[in-house]
Structures are given as C-alpha cells and as structure tokens.
C-alpha cells in the first residue's frame, strides 16, 4: 500500500523523493516486508532520506540531550546497517539512500561491521560482501560540525557521495554549512 502512495506522490504530485524514519515501528528497515517500498522508490528514481525521529528506549536518552546527540545518529546507523546486513541493497540495487548526520556512526565504525561480517555468522548472509563495500551505495550529508570528521567521511566514501546538509531549523544544525564544505571537501 505504501508503495502505491509513493507512486502517487512522485508521479502525480511531483515530489522528488521520500524521507523515512530508520525506526520503522520497531522493525528493521532491511526486513524484506519493506521491499515493495524500496523497489517503488528505485523504480521511480526517487531517493530516500533516512532521518531519525522516533527513538527506541527513549528513557535512556532522556538526559543531557542524549536523544539528539547520540540517539539520532544511532538510529541512522541502525537503518544503514539493516539495509546492508539485511540484504536490501542487494535485492534493490538501483535504490538511492541518503544518510543524515554524516551517516551516523556507520562510516566511522565500518571496520567493526566488517569484522562482525568476518567472524559472526548472524552478521553475514550467503554471498554478501563485507559492509565496507556498501559505503558508496549511500549518500551522506555534511552535518558533522567538525571539518576533520567531514574530511574523514569524504576520504572514505568519496567526495561525490557527500551532499550539503544543514539540519535547518533544528538546534544542532550547521549555521555555516557552505563554509565548512568549502574548507573541507572542495577540489584542490
């Protein structure tokens, strides 16, 4: 049903893509039950942005603004990891996914994901490549607040996979995204 709604939104209303919460009511995004949605997005050429909104175990994130500082990048990481480890990116190769907050923790802990793939059967599907081989299947926004972190991201995924992001109007948004982008990833 959601795939039909997406087709109407893109074809009839002119929308260019979709934004989904990585927390799909407690189900992993890589669950094959969501494949009709992912296939519809790919068929329409509509990118899907993973942007967290709902947190699991919210009581653990309730102090010190942790829901935003840790919780949202954590949810982005869960969404990306589920799409990779659950096989969605293999089943729907034309799918375009944008990860906000610089991809959460996924690009920075991809070595840990690779090690899990190598050593733990539950983190590996038959025929699946190591998670690091999927890094360039995603696009990433620049919302990292540190030039060094953005330089690392661009170095590991490629400059062509990094998109300007501001997170406007939220409080943790980057007030000068163009300046940070120019300093960090402009061609030399």
What do these predicted regions represent?
Residues 1-86:
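Active-site gating/metal-coordination segments in enzymes
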Residues 65-85, 92, 96, 100-188:
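H/E-rich (His + Asp/Glu) clusters that bind or coordinate divalent metals
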